[in-house]
Design a protein with these regions (language model features):
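A common structural junction motif
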Residues: 58, 138-146
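Conserved polymerase palm-domain catalytic core
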Residues: 11, 16-117, 122-136, 151, ...
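A short alpha-helix capping/helix-loop junction motif
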Residues: 2-5
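Right-hand nucleic-acid polymerase module
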Residues: 70-73, 78, 131-132, 138, ...
Length: 197
C-alpha cells in the first residue's frame, strides 16, 4: 500500500509527510484531517490472528514454524503481544494492519488515507465525513484487538497538523520542537564522543 510508510524500504516519515503535502496541494479542498494512534499497538496484536494472516501468504513448511516462533517469542504462553525490538515485528505490524488499510482506502480514497506504524492520518474536505471514517476505523480495529487512544481528533490543517515530526499549517510547515531538541541531543553526543577519541 503506497500510503503506509513504516519499516518499508524507501518509505519513511519524511516521505509520507511530503506525500500528504503534495496530495493537499493537488486538492486544495482537503482542509481537514483526522488523526489517531493505537494504544500499545504491538502489545495488543493477537497471536492466533497474526498467525492466520501469515498463513495466507506463506505455506513453506520450514519457514512457517520459524515465523510462528517470532510471533510468540515475547509471550510464549499467552495469545497477545509481539516484541517491539525485532525487525520481524515491524513487518508483522504492517501485515497485521493490512486488511484494515485496504478497507479504509476503499472508503476514504487512496490519497486521503495514510499510516505510519500505528499513527493514522486521513485528509478530508469536511469534518462530518472524517468522523464517519473515524467510526469505520474503530469498527474495523475492534476484531483485531486494537484500541484507538482517546486523543484522536478531527481538526483543520490550518490549526497545525502534528504529523511525522513536523507541524503542517497548510500554507507552511515546520519541524516539531521536540524533533529538533532530540536531534540536537544526538548531535551533542556524537560531538562528545569525537572529542574523547
Amino acid at each position: 500500500i503506497e500510503n503506509t510508510a513504516a519499516s518499508l524500504e524507501g518509505r519513511g516519515p519524511h516521505g509520507l509527510f511530503h506525500k500528504m503535502q503534495e496530495v493537499r496541494a493537488e486538492n486544495p479542498d482537503l482542509i481537514y484531517y483526522y488523526q489517531s494512534d493505537y494504544k500499545g499497538y504491538y502489545d495488543h496484536i493477537l497471536h492466533d490472528k497474526m498467525i492466520d494472516i501469515i498463513k495466507q501468504y506463506i505455506a513453506d513448511p520450514i519457514l512457517l514454524p520459524i515465523l510462528i516462533d517470532f510471533v510468540k517469542v515475547l509471550h510464549p504462553d499467552g495469545n497477545e503481544g509481539i516484541s517491539k525490538g525485532l525487525r520481524s515485528s515491524q513487518f508483522f505490524g504492517n501485515l497485521y494492519h493490512n486488511d484494515i488499510d485496504h478497507a479504509m482506502i476503499e472508503e476514504c480514497g487512496k490519497d486521503n488515507y495514510n499510516r505510519f506504524c500505528d499513527d493514522i492520518y486521513i485528509l478530508g474536505d469536511n469534518k462530518k465525513e472524517l468522523w464517519k471514517h473515524r467510526d469505520t476505523l474503530h469498527r474495523l480495529s475492534k476484531p483485531y484487538n486494537l484500541i484507538i487512544k482517546p486523543s484522536e481528533k478531527v481538526a483543520p490543517v490550518s490549526a497545525g497538523m502534528d504529523a511525522l515530526g513536523y507541524i503542517d499549517y497548510g500554507d507552511h510547515s515546520r519541524i516539531r520542537k521536540r524533533t529538533k531538541v532530540n536531534a540536537a541531543r544526538k548531535l551533542a553526543k556524537i560531538k562528545s564522543r569525537k572529542r574523547r577519541q
